[in-house]
A protein has these predicted regions:
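Non-transmembrane, aqueous-exposed alpha-helical and coiled segments at domain scale
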Residues: 1-336
């Protein structure tokens, strides 16, 4: 089977959690592995009316048969992790690489007393950045040093590669978005490491030739939480009028919003080597699309928007989110 890497194409909050949850349930991969920075970013999953907001556990946990892995590139907060294990009930299916750096209370305190991080850059204050910085100095504690994590220890790179060798499916979940990348984003208004597809693969121990697809998640409008530039930013009143007001999963802060940006989308396709696009929340720019699960039933306005995205990016829009639930989705991956 294949290896599909899911990453964000804007500033995070594109709906990666929904896409990963759908793919985990639809494609039934053997493994869902999480890359990214750490608990500084949250993914929201809604199924059967129940909402899960996750910062550590892979969003594919809804597939009760898959193995859930956290790669060595991800910083782990044991407290956040324990809470999410209890909420999701995945204790027996979870594996954490022993090389994951561990976020300690002092990391969180360092970020929360930093005026530069909190006030100027809009950090979430999760301790992830301080942990990553200490890892670069080679002084950070790792998961193998934490007794309460001992039973979860797993050689994540070996597991994901061996699964692929056996013909099993692997789904890799990225976090945040292309323009929050430390290398390719709006520095210094960015996260503490690269979060593009190549980095997410490295986070879980996958070489580039193991990847079958890179699914770039784009929302039908652009949002950004915290500080930093947002091209085409709308006034708060206009955001409310359009029904685009959202709130950060981790911080609860209002997200600023702007119309879909084709320039950003094209560059994100290039930077991530995207093979396909997943478009979310089309129902918020075309209300008649709400809940639709067939492309033919979409209103003309929505189809024209999708066709323009495909034309401008030269990539197919294969998944289209039409509502908040995981299965509010049009799946065009196997169309003739």
């Amino acid at each position: 089977m294949s290896c599909n890497v899911v990453v964000g194409g804007f500033f995070g909050d594109e709906g990666k959690g929904k896409i990963v949850a759908y793919l985990a349930l639809k494609d039934r991969p053997a493994i869902v592995a999480r890359g990214g920075v750490g608990p500084n970013a949250g993914h929201t999953v809604i199924v059967d009316g129940k909402k899960y907001s996750l910062r550590m556990i892979p969003s594919g946990f809804l597939n009760s048969e898959c193995r859930l892995l956290i790669g060595p590139g991800v910083s782990v907060d044991p407290g956040v992790l324990a809470m999410e294990i209890e909420i999701t009930g995945v204790d027996s299916r979870l594996g954490i690489d022993p090389h994951c750096p561990v976020i300690e209370k002092r990391h969180i305190e360092q970020e929360n007393i930093s005026e530069h991080l909190k006030a100027k850059l809009g950090s979430t204050g999760s301790g992830s950045g301080a942990c990553v910085a200490e890892r670069a100095l080679r002084t950070v504690k790792t998961a193998k040093d934490v007794p309460e994590l001992a039973k979860y220890m797993a050689d994540v790179p070996s597991e994901v590669n061996e699964a692929l060798d056996k013909g099993m499916g692997v789904l890799v979940e990225g976090t945040q978005g292309t323009y929050l990348s430390l290398y390719h984003g709006t520095y210094p208004y960015c996260t503490s490491k690269d979060v593009c597809a190549s980095a997410i693969c490295s986070d879980v121990g996958l070489g580039p030739t193991r990847v079958s697809d890179v699914t770039l998640v784009l929302k039908s409008f652009v949002t950004r939480v915290g500080e930093g530039p947002l091209p085409g930013q709308l006034s708060r009143d206009e955001v409310l009028r359009r029904g685009w007001m959202e709130y950060g999963t981790v911080t609860g802060r209002e997200r600023r919003a702007a119309p879909f940006d084709f320039n950003l989308a094209r560059r994100a396709v290039m930077l991530n080597g995207a093979t396909q696009i997943a478009l979310t929340k089309i129902d918020l720019i075309s209300p008649e699309a709400s809940g639709v699960r067939s492309y033919e039933e979409l209103p003309v306005k929505a189809k024209e928007f999708i066709e323009r995205i495909e034309g401008e990016t030269m990539r197919p829009v294969t998944l289209i989110g039409t509502g908040p639930s995981t299965f509010d989705m049009i799946d065009r991956r196997h169309r003739e």
